[in-house]
């Protein structure tokens, strides 16, 4: 029977996406996130028992490697990469790395135990697809099976993107989701009343996973998923464009976004660490956008821009 090697990295919450990327790049077959914030404030609504945890800024990122992997080399590389991330200004915290062997059947499902239903915004709750959940009145439930290589929607960058969509969408809009990943932002847009959603990702795996997640949610036939390199070659106009990806990539799409967004439409950009904030602001302002909202959670920033001639209450341009 084949065995797998489980590596757990304890880092600051702000480093979640960057460290997850490091683990995937070193050969992990997927990652899971254990975050105390997912449990804080949870109520035993229908007999569920949630762990008794204290709020902490540290999270555990669990990665799974084939038994043939030279774990000593992998751990050395992980530590080198984390030190480099810290030198760039990303808050990684006091890093510790643990490892253990895991049987095949345990590996297949072990990562799922770290995911619980999570209320993300006033209206939106993300629920793992394998969990039974009874929604309260008015609650909009996003069923998600992210797979081990995609986030579960609880990262600050995703939360802020979802909050922005909830504030902006009123029904009937056309939305473009750039770098859709698990598809969570597209599904949320549909649940919040958008008429048509176009979801693009350069990664073929993401395109497949996004479509699978969309199929888990009823009433999402208005979401169209396709492979795409940012907004290159896109001609469809939109009321809202949302992108939750790395800041260095965000700056490459602002001109195309301005071309595609209708007047009085919105551009939501998330995934921006603080040291990259000015770079993203400059790119959006140069494209012609005005800043309407700036959200911050820890080291992460999300920005809501508007394409408008009415500059009262907005900044930049």
UniProtKB/Swiss-Prot annotation:
Chain sites annotated for binding S-adenosyl-L-methionine: 158, 179, 201, 244
Transferase listed as a keyword: yes
Location within or outside the cell: Cytoplasm
Cross-referenced Pfam families: PrmA
Catalyzed chemical reaction(s): L-lysyl-[protein] + 3 S-adenosyl-L-methionine = N(6),N(6),N(6)-trimethyl-L-lysyl-[protein] + 3 S-adenosyl-L-homocysteine + 3 H(+)
Family: Belongs to the methyltransferase superfamily. PrmA family.
Protein name: Ribosomal protein L11 methyltransferase
Entry EC no(s): 2.1.1.-
Family matches, as CDD domains: AdoMet_MTases
GO molecular function annotations of the record: protein-lysine N-methyltransferase activity
This protein's record includes keyword Metal-binding: no
Cellular component aspect of the GO annotation: cytoplasm
Superkingdom in the source lineage: Bacteria
Designated gene of the protein: prmA
Lineage of producing organism: Bacteria, Bacillati, Bacillota, Bacilli, Lactobacillales
Gene source species: Streptococcus pyogenes serotype M28 (strain MGAS6180)
NCBIfam families: prmA
Protein's job: Methylates ribosomal protein L11.
Gene3D superfamilies xref list: Vaccinia Virus protein VP39
Main localization, broad class: cytoplasm
Record keywords: Cytoplasm, Methyltransferase, S-adenosyl-L-methionine, Transferase
GO biological process: methylation
């Amino acid at each position: 029977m084949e065995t797998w090697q489980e590596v757990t990295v304890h880092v600051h919450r702000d480093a979640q996406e960057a460290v997850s990327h490091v683990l995937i790049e070193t050969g992990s077959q997927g990652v899971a996130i254990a975050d105390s914030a997912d449990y804080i404030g949870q109520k035993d609504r229908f007999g569920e028992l949630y762990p008794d945890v204290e709020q902490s800024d540290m999270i555990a990122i669990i990665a799974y490697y084939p038994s043939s992997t030279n774990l000593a080399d992998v751990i050395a590389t992980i530590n080198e990469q984390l030190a480099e991330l810290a030198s760039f200004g990303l808050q990684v915290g006091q890093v510790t790395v643990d490892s253990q062997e895991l049987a095949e059947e345990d590996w297949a499902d072990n990562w799922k135990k770290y995911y619980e239903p999570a209320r993300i915004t006033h209206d939106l709750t993300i629920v793992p697809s394998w969990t039974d959940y009874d929604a309260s009145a008015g609650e909009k439930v996003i069923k998600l099976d992210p797979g081990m290589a995609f986030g579960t929607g609880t990262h600050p960058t995703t939360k802020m993107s979802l909050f922005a969509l909830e504030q902006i969408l009123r029904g009937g809009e056309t939305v473009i989701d750039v770098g859709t990943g698990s598809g969570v932002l597209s599904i949320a847009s549909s649940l919040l009343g958008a008429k048509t959603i176009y979801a693009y990702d350069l990664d073929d795996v993401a395109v497949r996973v996004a479509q699978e997640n969309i199929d888990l949610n009823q009433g999402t036939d208005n979401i169209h998923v396709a492979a795409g390199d940012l907004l290159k070659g896109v001609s469809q106009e939109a009321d809202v464009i949302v992108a939750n990806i790395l800041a260095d990539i965000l700056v490459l799409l602002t001109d195309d976004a301005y071309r595609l967004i209708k007047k009085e439409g919105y551009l939501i950009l998330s995934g921006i660490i603080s040291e990259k904030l000015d770079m993203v602001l400059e790119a959006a302002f140069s494209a012609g956008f005005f800043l309407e909202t700036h959200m911050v959670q820890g080291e992460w920033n999300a920005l809501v821009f508007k394409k408008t001639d009415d500059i009262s209450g907005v900044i930049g341009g």
